[in-house]
């Protein structure tokens, strides 16, 4: 559901609360800085009036001194405003990145299955980076424009009430009406541009990962053509945004010129009617002409906000997204796992029934085998045991406690889950295995690798355990990746081991070694082994079959 721009800004503003005192400092420095710049022009006009022999009650030397002081102050105030404003921006960007990563952890595993990697990369990098525009160049300028304009209207009030009306109309038109109109007209362009960039990132990432297949099947030219087509769409969307920015500048310049002319004629009329003297006339006109800086900054914001609000909406949507299941924190901790009982479990993905009335029991010291064809629901049952999902009906108990009554962290700490695909990080082999237990020694890692029948292979590499992995483990075969995943499970040393097709990519020799390792640790573990291989099922104490979601 699309959020209103003001709603997005409101949510983004809430994040500033811890740094409100620094934001107040930024606004103060910015307001004083603009006033210093404006009054340099006003004092210059006052000096001109003095030269024309009109009495302004100020000496020429006093005006010159004030001009020098204001010029120096303007530089210092501008520096302090920019420094504090960008401190807030980058502090909040770091906070947002932390929140986004925490949100991704919270949404894993279930919700992230439906999200494209390229879109997430675009969000974590480009979208968050674009929010710097909002925090450093939007919040403070809005408040600075408000306070500066309010102070200047008080100054205009000392000259003429008509000047106040003209200045108020000018500030509202340039700083409020024009930005609102242009933002509404072009907001969809900014959102569409961010979506196209995210889609392009995803498409390009997909192309890089599938480069071998693209070359093998002669699909390179078509893929390149599609990249060019997508790039053209991005260019078109970007051109629309730039066209909008140009229109905003034109509208702003026209509005400024019109109100300058109105102020000039208003001053001339008042002067001709002896309502104001020449000094008030000249100061009033120059004051308005030199005071557009803060409100023009607001007008220019509208074009930048088109992309910023679209990025903010994407980030906020991710932060607000709820996980499939919330982690349980104030419940039972698992200790001395002795048995798992699955009782009359039914589960469906949407309308598609996956498991129907499944029941089983397995005790510590046993290996339970689950056999069945691909798509029969075997892997889904393991995900239910990990509590990635809850069953639609029935229950799953560990030591007599249902999973919703067990602390999620404790549940996961007591389980080692080996999936069909092992993800390899761009780190050394040692660090890839250590992922299972961060405080593990090299000796413990090597022992786990021996159990997983991968130790000898690692030692055969030039750098051994310090061998750096390429992206996605491109320098390993599928079987080698799988054995590293199994080594992680052995290192984790959890009392419950869940294995989903652990030997599917292994030859018979390595399969036998892995199965022997499982038998060696069987007495202290509760093992559930999913496989379609009859040879793997041979080590199991009991085997159940699942066919079309039902026990057979």
Curated annotation (Swiss-Prot):
SMART domains documented for this protein: AAA (SM00382)
UniProt keyword terms in alphabetical order: ATP-binding, Cell inner membrane, Cell membrane, Membrane, Nucleotide-binding, Transmembrane, Transmembrane helix, Transport
Cellular component GO terms, alphabetical: plasma membrane
Topology in membrane: Multi-pass membrane protein
Transmembrane segments: 22-42, 52-72, 139-159, 162-182, 253-273, 278-298
ATP-binding found in the keyword field: yes
Superkingdom per UniProt: Bacteria
Species name: Haemophilus influenzae (strain ATCC 51907 / DSM 11121 / KW20 / Rd)
InterPro entries: AAA+_ATPase, ABC1_TM_dom, ABC1_TM_sf, ABC_CydC/D, ABC_transporter-like_ATP-bd, P-loop_NTPase, Type_1_exporter
Annotated NCBIfam families: CydC
Chain positions recorded as ATP binding sites: 372-379
Name under which the protein is recorded: Probable ABC transporter ATP-binding/permease protein HI_0664
GO molecular function: ABC-type transporter activity; ATP binding; ATP hydrolysis activity; ATPase-coupled transmembrane transporter activity
Signal peptide, first to last residue: none
Residue ranges occupied by any ABC transporter domain in the UniProt entry: 340-552
Keyword NADP attributed: no
Family note: Belongs to the ABC transporter superfamily. Lipid exporter (TC 3.A.1.106) family.
GO biological process: cell redox homeostasis; glutathione transmembrane transport
PANTHER family linked: ATP-BINDING CASSETTE SUB-FAMILY B, TRANSPORT ATP-BINDING PROTEIN CYDC
Domain named ABC transmembrane type-1: residues: 23-307
Location of the protein in the cell: Cell inner membrane
């Amino acid at each position: 559901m699309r959020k209103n721009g003001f709603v997005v800004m409101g949510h983004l503003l809430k994040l500033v609360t811890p740094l409100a005192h620094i934001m107040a400092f930024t606004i103060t420095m910015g307001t004083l800085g603009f006033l210093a710049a404006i009054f340099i022009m006003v004092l210059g006009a006052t000096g001109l009036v003095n030269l024309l022999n009109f009495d302004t009650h100020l000496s020429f030397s006093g005006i010159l001194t004030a001009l020098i002081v204001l010029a120096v102050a303007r530089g210092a105030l501008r520096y302090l405003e920019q420094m504090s404003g960008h401190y807030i921006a980058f502090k909040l960007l770091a906070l947002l990145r932390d929140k986004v990563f925490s949100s991704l952890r919270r949404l894993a595993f279930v919700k992230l299955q439906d999200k494209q990697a390229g879109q997430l990369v675009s969000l974590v990098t480009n979208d968050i980076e674009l929010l710097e525009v909002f925090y450093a160049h939007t919040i403070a300028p809005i408040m600075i424009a408000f306070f500066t304009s309010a102070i200047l209207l008080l100054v205009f009030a000392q000259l003429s009430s008509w000047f106040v009306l003209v200045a108020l109309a000018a500030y509202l038109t340039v700083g409020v009406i024009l930005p609102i109109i242009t933002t509404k007209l072009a907001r969809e362009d900014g959102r569409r541009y961010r979506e196209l960039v995210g889609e392009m990132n995803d498409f390009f990432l997909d192309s890089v990962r599938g480069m071998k297949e693209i070359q093998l099947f002669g699909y390179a030219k078509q893929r390149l053509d599609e990249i060019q087509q997508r790039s053209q769409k991005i260019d078109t969307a970007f051109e629309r945004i730039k066209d909008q920015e140009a229109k905003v500048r034109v509208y702003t310049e026209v509005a400024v010129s019109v109100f300058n002319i109105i102020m000039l004629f208003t001053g001339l009329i008042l002067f001709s009617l002896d309502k104001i003297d020449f000094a008030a006339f000249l100061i009033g006109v120059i004051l308005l002409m030199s005071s557009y800086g803060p409100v023009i900054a607001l007008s220019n914001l509208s074009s930048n906000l088109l992309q910023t609000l679209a990025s903010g909406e994407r980030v906020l949507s991710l932060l607000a997204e709820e996980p499939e299941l919330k982690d349980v924190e104030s419940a039972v901790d698992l200790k001395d796992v002795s048995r798992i009982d699955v009782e009359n479990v039914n589960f469906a993905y949407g309308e598609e029934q996956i498991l129907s009335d499944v029941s089983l029991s397995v005790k510590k010291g046993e290996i339970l085998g689950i056999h069945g064809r691909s798509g029969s629901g075997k892997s889904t049952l393991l995900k239910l045991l990990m509590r990635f999902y809850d069953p639609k009906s029935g229950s799953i108990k560990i030591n007599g406690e249902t999973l919703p009554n067990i602390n999620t962290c404790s549940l996961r700490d007591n389980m080692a889950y080996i999936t069909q695909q092992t993800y390899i990080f761009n780190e050394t082999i040692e660090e890839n295995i250590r992922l299972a237990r961060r405080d593990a020694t090299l000796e413990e890692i090597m022992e786990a690798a021996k159990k997983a029948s991968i130790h000898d292979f690692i030692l055969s590499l030039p750098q051994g355990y310090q061998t750096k992995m390429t992206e996605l483990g491109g320098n390993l075969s599928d079987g080698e990746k799988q054995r590293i995943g199994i080594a992680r499970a052995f290192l984790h040393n959890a009392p419950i081991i869940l294995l989903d097709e652990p030997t599917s990519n292994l030859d018979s020799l390595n399969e036998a070694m892995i199965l022997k390792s499982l038998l060696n640790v069987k007495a202290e573990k509760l093992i559930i082994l999913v496989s379609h291989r009859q040879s793997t099922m041979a080590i199991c104490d009991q085997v159940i079959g699942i066919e079309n979601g039902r026990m057979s």
